[in-house]
């Protein structure tokens, strides 16, 4: 019997794969979260395509130059290995684009680039808009909370994992639903005050 696997797993960048540094334009500040490389390598070994879907509103705000964004993303790949697709929304909150999470555009674009149906993808992220974008695209969303994750985002998530290793294991086991972990890598007590828009 063939083991089920997702058509692709798409990750948020900041706060999920690497430490969240607000409006980071410095590759030297890129720091993977614990276990990120191992979780990604597990998917690579299984032949599952992986990608990044990330909001980068600092570009629209003039805080991140496009070339610096590319340099930061290149550093992410240097530390975590290659991704099969990157999709970045450079727009601001009020720009009205279709790609900015929680809208489904980034997820749909990434799935299209990989040649897979969005409904067979899994999206892993650390805040509500990541799993909301997954839901809007018809994909499966898994939340990995950090201190920036709001309690209501945890409560609203259909699936919650303590860390990336658990999220990847859950992504590859659609029939298994382990107990929800309130907090994960954080306390789940994040506040809107001080949370930098992405």
Where are these regions (language model features)?
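Substrate-recognition element of Asp-dependent hydrolases with the DxDx(T/V) motif
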Residues: 36, 40-73, 83-95, 134
